[in-house]
Amino acid sequence: MWMGGIVKHLANLAIAAGVFIFTKLYAEIISFNSIDFEGSNLVGQILVMAFVIQWIAYIPAFVFKTEKFYDITGSFTYIGTILFALYASGSFQNLKLGNIFIGLAIIIWAIRLGSFLFMRIHKDKKDGRFDSIKTSFSQFFMTWTLQGMWVFICSSAALIAIANPSGVPINSVFILGLSLIHI
């Protein structure tokens, strides 16, 4: 029984490591045209940021055996990574409106979804998905790591567009895509 528990923890930690490695490889593939920020690839920096936010939030979540801020941390990660991408790419300083509009669309979406999920979990007092997960340090860690991957991959199209040296052009395709968000 004792060895089985160790094997499960090692398997969960191996999955978490595999998730990070997979996402890192994905980031390297998609960021071939990314600008550098302070000497390294911006998309790669954002990847690390997404995971570090998750891992830092995991610590108090595991200590207190709570999932109450899991979803809001995901939203915060979307917002933080997009704001960092906009800042590091010079979007605000150079008024790259296409970058700013894409960033704002994701930020508004993250605030909307995050506040809904946060209010839901505080109303319900728990999220049943986590009942068996939050008691296992490795399974809970794997779950937080998966959220880092989820945030990075879901926002990767916007991140690589913002991190492109040319920025995001405002044209008919841009307007069509931006309008789809409001549907």
Predicted regions and their residues:
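N-terminal membrane topogenic signal
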Residues: 2-16
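Hydrophobic, membrane-facing alpha-helical anchors
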Residues: 19-27, 46-60
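Intramembrane catalytic core of multi-pass membrane enzymes that act on lipidic substrates
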Residues: 63, 67-165, 175-177
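Conserved small/polar residues in nucleotide/adenosyl-binding loops
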Residues: 181-183
